[in-house]
């Protein structure tokens, strides 16, 4: 594959075939893409050195998880940071198998993997290995966040190694398919782990109304997904006259009791990640990126971008593991914020949003929900969830939610919700018709609700009046999709376009066995989805 780069892991990849020029659509340069491939190859070499199926230490697992997370879309644009990560992986391999580097007759069994072998492979093999790779990249983000809170799972850790080992060897479609579904199985465990970590650390999320108004005076915007970073920043800014506003996937933080107690956690600024270059333009406040999604900043706010953990951008101030946020705090005081309160609105004009309808909150009303379904007051549930993005066509999700019948409830999670989360759809029997369940990893909660409802009605999840309408952009959406497939969930609508890494044969397999279909129009899809449960 004689191209400057090759990457097709995100939904916006050029022509739905792959980014191959001087830079990707996400903004990463060709050299950065090549370094990400080198890092992935080094990770596969590390997995080979461990022999794939062997148990691994916590230290080795953390290196693998950090390395995989670094390659997720919109995480790191910093070549130096990626090179440092590559050396970290190689050092861990040297620690585990020091004799390999000194061997006079190398066997090749622990060599690093050349990713060109994958990109140039038979299209079905490439498709399945890509599903595995992108799935574990997404899962690594969840494992990383759990690890930050000192939660880990030995089975999850070991599977990263097993999956990388599989990618590095010749396999058949028949032997790869079970591993693809196993990514979904292990990701379910990983999301459960993160759910436990978040709720045991910060409390069970509670339905919470969040203002979109930014008060006058100094403030800091926190984006990404990492609740621990937000907690530490709240602690360090307490009493300093600085307000904190969430952005994007940090919105659900407002629902956690331990975080809600901070009076200077005021509200949410902006919408989803792809609007940041417009929303942050000349922003009189610093922005702290705790995870993806980072876009190359415009010059009008580049001096107020701060990164931490695996997020990195050349020239941006990086807050290291000591977590001293003094530079961010000083920048907030220097910029001063707005002179007067600023009333902002969501995409549809709403000035407040509600979050915190996690699985515990919804299931606390389980009897009400069951009775409403039996009486006919609730006729259908829609899970309209997933990533947002810049590609045209994503207004489909806004229109879909607007057009859902008045006797239906829409559940949502992840940043795709910003297309419609400021809408007021009213209530059914005291329950909001639109409920935000949280971040993308809170897909675990949606699954728990679905399973509980199926148990209550004595049926399978596929027999429930429940439909999945998903939007995707990056690799966390891939691992969630694989979890749904592992659970046997059928008739999922996926958009706005299908993944470029799905070959025609693999796509056909998913269509025939799981009923996956691309989104069409809101009207047609609502009609078709509701007909499944007649």
Q: Where do the PLM segments sit?
A:
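Anaerobic metallocofactor- and corrinoid-dependent redox/one-carbon enzyme cores
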Residues: 2-37, 41-45, 55, 178, ...
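Electropositive, gly/pro-rich neighborhoods at or near active sites that engage anionic ligands
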Residues: 43-201
């Amino acid at each position: 594959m004689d191209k400057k780069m090759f990457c097709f892991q995100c939904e916006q990849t050029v022509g739905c075939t792959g980014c191959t020029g001087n830079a990707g659509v996400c903004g990463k340069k060709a050299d950065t893409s090549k370094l990400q491939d080198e890092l992935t190859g080094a990770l596969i070499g590390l997995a080979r050195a461990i022999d794939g199926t062997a148990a691994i230490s916590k230290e080795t697992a953390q290196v693998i998880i950090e390395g995989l997370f670094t390659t997720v879309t919109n995480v790191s644009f910093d070549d130096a940071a990626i090179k440092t990560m590559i050396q970290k992986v190689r050092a861990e391999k040297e620690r585990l198998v020091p004799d390999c580097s000194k061997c006079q007759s190398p066997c090749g069994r622990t060599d690093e993997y050349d990713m060109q072998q994958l990109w140039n492979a038979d299209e079905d093999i490439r498709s399945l290995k890509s599903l595995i790779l992108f799935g574990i990249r997404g899962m690594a983000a969840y494992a990383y966040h759990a690890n930050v809170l000192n939660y880990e799972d030995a089975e999850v850790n070991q599977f990263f190694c097993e999956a990388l080992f599989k990618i590095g060897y010749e396999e058949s479609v028949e032997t790869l398919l079970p591993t693809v579904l196993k990514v979904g199985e292990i990701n379910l465990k990983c999301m459960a782990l993160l759910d436990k970590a978040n709720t045991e650390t910060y409390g069970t999320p509670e339905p919470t109304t969040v203002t979109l108004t930014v008060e006058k005076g100094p403030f800091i915007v926190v984006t990404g997904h990492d609740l621990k970073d937000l907690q530490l920043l709240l602690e360090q800014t307490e009493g300093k006259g600085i307000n904190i506003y969430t952005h994007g996937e940090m919105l659900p933080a407002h629902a956690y009791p331990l975080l809600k107690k901070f009076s200077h956690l005021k509200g949410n600024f902006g919408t989803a990640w792809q609007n940041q270059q417009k929303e942050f333009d000349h922003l009189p406040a610093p922005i702290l990126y705790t995870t993806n999604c980072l876009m190359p900043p415009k010059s009008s706010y580049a001096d107020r971008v701060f990164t931490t953990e695996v997020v990195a951008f050349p020239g941006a101030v990086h807050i290291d593991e000591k977590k001293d946020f003094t530079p961010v705090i000083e920048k907030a005081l220097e910029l001063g914020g707005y002179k007067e309160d600023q009333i902002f609105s969501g995409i549809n004009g709403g000035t407040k949003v509600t979050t915190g309808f996690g699985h515990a909150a919804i299931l606390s009303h389980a009897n009400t929900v069951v009775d409403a379904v039996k009486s006919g007051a609730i006729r259908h549930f829609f899970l309209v969830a997933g990533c947002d993005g810049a590609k045209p066509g994503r207004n489909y999700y806004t229109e879909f939610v607007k057009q859902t019948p008045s006797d239906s409830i829409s559940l949502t999670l992840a940043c795709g919700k910003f297309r419609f989360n400021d809408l007021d759809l009213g209530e059914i029997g005291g329950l909001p018709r639109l409920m935000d369940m949280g971040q993308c990893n809170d897909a675990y909660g949606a699954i728990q609700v679905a399973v509980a409802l199926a148990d209550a009605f004595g049926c399978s999840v596929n027999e429930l009046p429940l439909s999945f309408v998903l939007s995707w952009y990056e690799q966390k959406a891939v691992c969630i999709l694989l979890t749904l497939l592992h659970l046997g969930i059928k008739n999922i609508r996926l958009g706005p376009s299908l993944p470029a890494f799905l070959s025609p044969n693999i796509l056909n397999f998913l269509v025939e066995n799981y009923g996956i279909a691309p989104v069409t129009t809101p009207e047609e899809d609502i009609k078709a989805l509701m007909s499944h449960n007649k």
